[in-house]
Amino acid sequence: MGSPGAFRAWLSTSSESALARVTTGASAGRPLRLYDGTLVAADLGDLVDAGPRAAIDVDFKGVALKDTTAVWTGTLANGSDNPTRDCAGWTTRSGQTGSIGVQPKTNSQWTEGKVNEPCGASYRIYCVELAK
């Protein structure tokens, strides 16, 4: 994959959706690939319209994730925020709930898998590399 560029987390808040976060600075027609080169989506539009073409099943070092993993997103399948499901804008670990995606799902559950997860839980996050 070459040298890494800047990344943004696929996380939504009430003031900024995950899609808006990663679209800023990203090319609309740029393919999204895993660290190992596997095509995930033709572009961001494809990702939110159809979900990932391949499971997002490697970490940022290219290490395979063997088990089903929860991933913090606060994000609906269309890339918009899941209202009141963002752990108070990702600022608290108690008294709030958030929504998660489920890795290795390739349907809408990749980002919109479950709501009401306690914010104190430790889950992964998805990151998207921005265009250079």
Protein language model features and the residues they cover:
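Secreted/extracellular ectodomain signature
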Residues: 1-132
